[in-house]
Amino acid sequence: MQDLTSAAAYYHQSMMMTTAKQNQPELPEQEQLKCPRCDSPNTKFCYYNNYNLSQPRHFCKNCRRYWTKGGALRNIPVGGGTRKSNKRSGSSPSSNLKNQTVAEKPDHHGSGSEEKEERVSGQEMNPTRMLYGLPVGDPNGASFSSLLASNMQMGGLVYESGSRWLPGMDLGLGSVRRSDDTWTDLAMNRMEKN
């Protein structure tokens, strides 16, 4: 009986080895090819391009460039050509949108004095500022510190210290009370009486 189990184990092990050998693709032995650019024999095989056996990729250690056997030679600079952005001293069009624009226009009262109109682009229609009742288009840019200085009174909403509602978590209309007994329908941006 013991001979039968050992024979079965041997048969199973030999079948597993045969199956493992069949699953591994036999890769051809890679020879040292000459570089098509500089004809240097100092090359090495890297990998198969996209795991395709018909497109082996090679690297020339002399000119430090890659090529695919049978592929077109591309004029790629040494080092692969980087896409790093250069540090530019000039301003780009996108940075001009972030800067303040100042337009001078004459006074209509005829006094000859000129006033400057300042506006910060991107702040005119800020939905977060509208949601919390902060001034929209404020050139001074009311900040979070100015909100704290106002004792958390956001556009007439008063934060109750006993509730667990925090600004920014949700609307929390059950734990927020208006000082003048009206509430704001934020979706329609209109005032209604209770």
Curated annotation (Swiss-Prot):
Composition bias type Basic and acidic residues, residue spans: 104-121
InterPro entries according to UniProt: Dof (IPR045174), Znf_Dof (IPR003851)
Coiled coil: none
Keywords per UniProt: DNA-binding, Metal-binding, Nucleus, Transcription, Transcription regulation, Zinc, Zinc-finger
Role according to the record: Transcription factor that binds specifically to a 5'-AA[AG]G-3' consensus core sequence.
Name recorded for this polypeptide: Dof zinc finger protein DOF1.7
Coarse class of the protein's main subcellular location: nucleus
A GO biological process held by the record: regulation of DNA-templated transcription
Pfam annotation, one family: Zn_ribbon_Dof
Intracellular or extracellular location(s): Nucleus
Molecular-function GO term, any one: zinc ion binding
Spans annotated as Disordered: 74-125
